Amino acid sequence: MAIDETATDFDQQVTGPLTVVDFWAPWCGPCKMMDPIMEKLEQTYGDRSKFVRFNVDGNQDIAQRYHVMSVPSLVLFRDGQAKEKVTGVYPEAKLAHYFERKIAE
């Protein structure tokens, strides 16, 4: 299950080989569409990468730090450094292909 993260220890949670941070908000319709997709992807790739959910409501400092201007946005971290950002809703198969490539890097 993805870790629901707060700003308190965000930097600690994004360390490691590959961490996928799902920036979302409870009022966001597209975020709700992504929830089941992200759950399936975490089941598939959770043994090879970490999945973190970050609610941007009340935590705008972290979102701004990584230039997250809209949700849903996925930011991929390697060893604590933000490497890529994907914004919007994508089909499960497209994200699965993307994660396969990123895990292999």
Regions found by a protein language model. Name each.
Residues 14-24:
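Short active-site neighborhood of thiol/selenol oxidoreductases, capturing the structured segment around
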Residues 19, 60, 66-75:
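Structural micro-motif
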